[in-house]
């Protein structure tokens, strides 16, 4: 049984929902949930940024019915204008883990394994989403400011 919408990346690194037979293509993976959890911008606290007007945040969080809950992660904060130190890689892993925490709380997965490593001028991420039935891995090469 399909549980999510299929998302793919084209040669220009643009993301698209796939279409099949005139409808959104479904998948057994957690594509949309993963991408929204990572790339949706959780609002940074005032202490995390140098200027309060740079706190960002995904617009959909304005409509949350759960007080204090925001979709997304601080992934954006940990990958922009930072040096790629081992300490910052750990902060990035923590931001990703925090963004995916809701899937564990909702019983969609049982745990995550996240590893960030430096690659020529960027970051490689390995994200494993582990459920009782299967393990789904995603790999990303990210190029960020060093």
Language model features: what each stretch is:
Residues 1-98, 102, 108-146:
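Immediate N-terminus of the mature polypeptide
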């Amino acid at each position: 049984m399909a549980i999510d919408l299929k998302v793919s990346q084209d040669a220009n690194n643009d993301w698209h929902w796939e279409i099949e037979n005139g409808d959104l293509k479904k998948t057994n993976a957690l594509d949309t949930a993963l991408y929204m959890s990572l790339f949706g911008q959780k609002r940074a606290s005032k202490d995390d940024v140098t200027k309060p007007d740079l706190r960002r945040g995904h617009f959909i969080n304005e409509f949350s019915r759960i007080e204090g809950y925001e979709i997304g992660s601080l992934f954006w904060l940990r990958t922009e204008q930072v040096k790629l130190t081992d300490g910052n890689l750990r902060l990035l892993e923590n931001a990703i883990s925090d963004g995916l925490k809701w899937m564990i709380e909702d019983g969609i997965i049982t745990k995550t394994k996240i590893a960030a490593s430096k690659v020529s001028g960027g970051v490689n991420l390995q994200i494993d989403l582990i459920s009782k039935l299967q393990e789904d891995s995603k790999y990303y090469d990210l190029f960020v400011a060093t």
